[in-house]
Amino acid sequence: MEPRAVADALETGEEDAVTEALRSFNREHSQSFTFDDAQQEDRKRLAKLLVSVLEQGLSPKHRVTWLQTIRILSRDRSCLDSFASRQSLHALACYADIAISEEPIPQPPDMDVLLESLKCLCNLVLSSPTAQMLAAEARLVVRLAERVGLYRKRSYPHEVQFFDLRLLFLLTALRTDVRQQLFQELHGVRLLTDALELTLGVAPKENPLVILPAQETERAMEILKVLFNITYDSVKREVDEEDAALYRYLGTLLRHCVMADAAGDRTEEFHGHTVNLLGNLPLKCLDVLLALELHEGSLEFMGVNMDVINALLAFLEKRLHQTHRLKECVAPVLSVLTECARMHRPARKFLKAQVLPPLRDVRTRPEVGDLLRNKLVRLMTHLDTDVKRVAAEFLFVLCSESVPRFIKYTGYGNAAGLLAARGLMAGGRPEGQYSEDEDTDTEEYREAKASINPVTGRVEEKPPNPMEGMTEEQKEHEAMKLVNMFDKLSRHRLIQPMGMSPRGHLTSLQDAMCETMEGQLSSDPDSDPD
């Protein structure tokens, strides 16, 4: 039924005709997410009529039908202004049983009404900044958090739980004040960690899950997304012993998530949200990833269970096949693996054995090939600076932050970006808590080491001499042409002579020489003026 006909029926006020018109409209547009511009004014008129009835109170008998129509029209951005009012939002919050000013409904609420109201609120908060502001002012997050805390005691349908969590996610994603309120005032990390444990159906010390059912997967992903929103700066925050224990408890549940498969084809998506949240944990809490007890069939390395680290590495390999949104795909898992390797020697040595095994092929450039090392070295020259930074950082840590070792595995040309950023172009080693790892060279590498081009990282075929057959006069002529070309480029500032500062940073040659001379003068006691 057309919006104009439905609006006409509403204006007549005849209940049966109105109900039938709304039901017909709902059936026809249940899967409509885009709308015809030609009927925009009719839809806006219908929305205003619905709002007037909503604010006065919907008939209990046909409440679900009215809310379904509101939900459909709330997808239309041209109708948002009508619905995004304080009175409309309050009415929807009351039907969803999350209005802060209302007493809890004594009798069990109508779950169909509650669900439709939640869906309407999700649509409005997603698309309307005004609705976002009003929802924050109405403190809807308080009653939502209360209901999430009741999931252990009261049985709510899957869809109600899912849209409770979806609304929490939208509010925390779009409103900084709601994010802080849930984190601090409502103890959101503890609340949602408990909800995650309930959803997974495991305790931290129990055996890992095998497959998480579809509905539990959907709810778990929403919980992970909300937790990500409210803990995004936890990695930078100093935490006390109580908070550290809570984050470790959360980490053990995330360990279950990493090891579990999701029903259907959502495993990679599920693991993606898990890895995103792992990246928010305080660094000292990542030790839980290596705390899994050894059991039959587990992957042991240096007496430590590496099942979780191996699963994260397998996830990284899958993500490296992505061709779009590479930063979102690989940066989180690379960051988690980097910190695990930096802080835990067994993890670093295990990852190095998998990613940077002893070099044998010395005739292929490090970025060429299908090995994990080759793919990561290719990322070191990616256009996205964040992608190349995390890839280089990961490989650098696997090399125990040793510059010669890093160059050996990646080539100086690929390594130059990180070395320049770290002030290590002249070599050396940054401060770091690393033991002296052995880096055993293969026989193939030792034999070819003297012939390896450090810039490309491989043995280069000897190129032909371009001056072969030239007379001395011709050679001198070509040399002067080259000098003149460089001089012209330099004078027009297309290129600039560079040098190495005493601190290991690339700088202009003139500045580098000045800094070197200043350093020599300051260290020479005889150079002080009289």
Curated annotation (Swiss-Prot):
Annotated consequence of substituting L383E:
Reduced ability to promote guanine exchange of G-alpha proteins
Effect on the protein upon substituting K225A = Does not affect ability to fold GNAQ
Q: Which residues carry this modification: Phosphoserine?
A: S435, S501, S522, S523, S527
Q: What is the effect of changing S435A?
A: Decreased ability to fold G-alpha proteins
Chief place of localization: cytoplasm
Compartments annotated for it: namely: Cytoplasm, Cell cortex; Cytoplasm
Is this entry keyworded Zinc? no
Q: Name one GO biological process term.
A: basement membrane organization
Question: What does changing R389A do?
Answer: Does not greatly affect ability to fold GNAQ
Residues found modified as Phosphothreonine? T440, T442
* PTM annotation, UniProt: Phosphorylated at Ser-435 and Thr-440 by CK2, stabilizing its interface with G alpha proteins.
Effect of changing T440A: reported as: Decreased ability to fold G-alpha proteins
On assembly, the entry states: Interacts with GDP-bound G alpha proteins GNAI1, GNAO1 and GNAQ, and with GNA13 with lower affinity. Does not interact with G-alpha proteins when they are in complex with subunits beta and gamma. Interacts (via C-terminus) with RGS14; the interaction stimulates the dissociation of the complex between RGS14 and the active GTP-bound form of GNAI1. Interacts with NCS1; interaction is favored in the absence of Ca(2+) and myristoylation of NCS1 is not required.
Functionally, this protein is described as follows: Chaperone that specifically binds and folds nascent G alpha proteins prior to G protein heterotrimer formation, promoting their stability and activity: folds GNAI1, GNAO1, GNA13 and GNAQ. Does not fold G(s) G-alpha proteins GNAS nor GNAL. Also acts as a guanine nucleotide exchange factor (GEF) for G alpha proteins by stimulating exchange of bound GDP for free GTP.
This protein is called: Chaperone Ric-8A
- Organism listed in the record: Rattus norvegicus (Rat)
